[in-house]
């Protein structure tokens, strides 16, 4: 969206993405990286989740599945003819300012340097390494301890007792996916909450 808006305003903008596909975390991945779960659906309506100048197609349900959101983003880039200005599969390792040239320097993985007048950094969601909280005594726990970033398949937890720590969207999605698969699902969180069935 930033790329599209900048180009509409007359900037000669280029978009970079380290992924080799459009859609970021909305594309499900088996890799231990941040992505949606296979069964993720949007928790707001498509009318609120869409960009103002590009509604979701009529045949998409009110709360689209992750794959439908990912396709929506692909369709968005095609509709606004953004692909020629996108460099997918390109990692920016560092951004510095060259005082002599008065340009921003992008150090691209592989050793290339490119110079730009302006830089907009637009990253969404958690894109780095998972950060597990320090839990006293966790080293004594004999079971597995994984971050939601690594949770991909509910069937891996079949007939197990699972504790989901937290009450964020990811925690709620994880717990929901485990119901009916795991033997027991518990949620631990700091604040009171009501769960409505």
Question: PLM features: residue spans?
Answer:
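Glycine-rich dinucleotide-binding loop and its adjacent helix/turn
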Residues: 50, 56-60, 65-72, 78, ...
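Generic structural signal for residues in well-ordered beta-strands
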Residues: 13, 86-88
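Core beta-strand elements of the Rossmann-like FAD/NAD(P) dinucleotide-binding domain
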Residues: 108-118, 158
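Glycine-rich active-site loop/strand segments that organize a redox cofactor
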Residues: 11, 18-75, 190-197
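A conserved short coil-to-beta-strand element within the FAD-binding core of flavoproteins
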Residues: 88-103
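Short glycine-/acidic-enriched loop or helix-start segments at secondary-structure transitions
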Residues: 2, 25, 130-132, 174-175, ...
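N-terminal Rossmann-like FAD-binding beta1-loop-alpha1 element of flavoenzymes
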Residues: 1-15, 171-178
């Amino acid at each position: 969206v930033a790329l599209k808006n900048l180009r509409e305003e007359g900037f000669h903008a280029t978009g970079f993405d380290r992924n080799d596909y459009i859609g970021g975390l909305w594309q499900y991945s088996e890799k231990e990286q941040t992505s949606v779960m296979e069964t993720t659906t949007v928790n707001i309506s498509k009318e609120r989740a869409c960009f103002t100048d590009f509604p979701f197609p009529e045949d998409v349900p009110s709360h689209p599945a992750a794959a439908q959101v990912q396709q929506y983003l692909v369709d968005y880039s095609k509709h606004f003819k953004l692909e020629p200005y996108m460099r997918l599969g390109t990692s920016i390792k560092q951004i510095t300012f060259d005082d002599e040239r008065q340009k921003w320097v992008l150090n691209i993985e592989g050793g290339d340097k490119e110079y730009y007048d302006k830089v907009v950094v637009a990253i969404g969601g958690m894109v780095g390494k998972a950060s597990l909280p320090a839990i006293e005594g966790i080293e004594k726990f004999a079971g597995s301890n994984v971050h939601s970033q690594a949770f991909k398949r509910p069937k891996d937890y079949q007939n197990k007792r699972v504790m989901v720590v937290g009450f964020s969207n990811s925690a709620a999605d994880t717990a929901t996916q485990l119901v009916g698969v795991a033997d027991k699902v518990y949620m631990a969180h700091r604040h009171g909450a009501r769960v409505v069935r």
